Swiss-Prot record:
Gene3D superfamilies: Aminomethyltransferase beta-barrel domains, Aminomethyltransferase fragment, Probable tRNA modification gtpase trme, domain 1. It catalyses: N(6)-[(R)-S(8)-aminomethyldihydrolipoyl]-L-lysyl-[protein] + (6S)-5,6,7,8-tetrahydrofolate = N(6)-[(R)-dihydrolipoyl]-L-lysyl-[protein] + (6R)-5,10-methylene-5,6,7,8-tetrahydrofolate + NH4(+). It comes from the Bacteria. The lineage of its organism: Bacteria, Pseudomonadati, Pseudomonadota, Gammaproteobacteria, Thiotrichales. Keywords: Aminotransferase, Transferase. The glycine cleavage system catalyzes the degradation of glycine. This is Aminomethyltransferase.
Length: 358
């Protein structure tokens, strides 16, 4: 199994390790709920070095990414980041990712751990007609520093000058400090940063964060946090069999420049014209029980919906899920252990900055 540069730190902290996409990763350090609540109320840190930063450089870097991605990087200013999907020719989602614009000729993309090899292969396969160099940065580590006190913690571990610049970063902005890249992004619905830095320096950084008030958090808390925030998990909520239209991600597909072609555009426009017969929703179970991926949602007209992600919400203290359901259907119920339980359909976003949205 693959190990991140912080593997020994996780073992020393008595983390429970699991196999995640071939990587030995911490699921928790004792209490997933405590780790979750700490990110909502204070500051938690995550090792996400199993994800991969890929640099796209060259005179046609922007031109290439305008073709590769469904969102339009031409809209990006330097030191800004953009969420988007990478589609195949059928408009199926190959991955969802964040693109960072360093300069007109240098972009950085962070890809999901389970798609590292396939994404890089897809980049290379589609880059042949462009003047670009694609460089997977395998010698970098990534640490997410998340929570309302993330700024306070990170300020304690860097110089005053750097602290001021980090604090001034706006959401979806980033800055390089030598080989370190600090972005005001995250996967929790809280304020925070993702720090991409040389693997040789990550242990010292991790330890100093812990010494200055941060608590480690595992992938278990990361999953419940992102679910509460209504953020998609690739491989669970969407994959190559789904288009952005069916998963509430149409907003991330930029069609404003009709002259721009991108992979999957033709199929996407056809699907858009045809219309989709499902909608992307949040699900709340008000009674006792747990919502899980794969569960059916039954409606009184005989139609069905399906939950793609589900869990107990530590913040709301109820079971929540993300699901696709028929556009027109009433009285949704889920079947749990032979009992039909009523669920409420809500907007697919439950918590932001520690506050309930439902």
């Amino acid at each position: 199994m693959l190990k991140t540069p912080l593997y020994e730190s996780h073992i020393a902290a008595n983390a429970k390790m699991i196999d995640f996409s071939g990587w030995s990763m911490p699921i928790n350090y004792g209490s997933q709920i405590q780790e979750h609540n700490n990110v909502r109320e204070d500051c938690g840190i995550f090792d996400v070095s199993h994800m991969l930063a890929v640099d796209i450089q060259g005179s046609e870097a922007e031109k290439f990414l305008r073709y590769l991605l469904a969102n339009d990087v031409a809209k990006l200013q330097e030191n800004k980041a953009q969420y988007g999907c990478m589609l195949n020719h059928d408009a199926g989602i190959v991955d969802d990712l964040i693109t960072y614009k360093v300069t007109d000729e240098h972009f950085r993309i962070v890809v999901n751990a389970g798609n590292r090899e396939s994404d890089v292969a897809w980049f290379n396969q589609n880059a042949q007609n462009f003047d670009v160099a694609i460089t997977p940065q395998t010698d970098l580590a990534i640490v997410a520093v998340q929570g309302p006190k993330a700024v306070a913690v990170i300020k304690r571990v860097v110089t005053k000058e750097i602290a001021a610049e980090i604090e001034a970063l706006l959401p979806f902005s980033f800055k390089f400090f030598s080989k370190w890249m600090v972005a005001r992004t995250g996967y929790t619905g809280e304020d925070g940063f993702e720090v991409i830095l040389p693997a040789t320096q990550v242990k010292k950084f991790w330890d100093s964060l812990l010494e200055n008030g941060a608590q480690p958090a595992g992938l278990g808390a990361r999953d419940t946090l992102r679910l509460e925030a209504g953020m998609h998990l690739y491989g669970a909520d969407m994959d190559t069999s789904t288009t952005p239209l069916e998963r509430g991600l149409g907003w991330s597909v930029d069609l404003s420049d009709e002259h721009r072609d991108f992979i999957g555009k033709k199929a996407y426009l056809a699907k858009k014209a045809q219309g989709v017969d499902t909608k992307w929703v949040g699900v709340v179970l008000k009674t006792k029980g747990v919502l899980r991926a794969g569960q059916e949602i039954d409606f009184d007209n005989g139609e069905k919906g399906y939950i793609t992600s589900g869990s107990f919400s530590p913040t709301l203290k109820v079971a929540i899920g993300l699901a696709y359901v028929p556009k027109q259907a009433d009285n949704p119920v889920v079947n749990i252990r032979g009992k039909e339980l009523e669920v409420e359909l809500v907007k697919p976003k439950f918590v932001k900055n520690g506050k309930s949205l439902i």
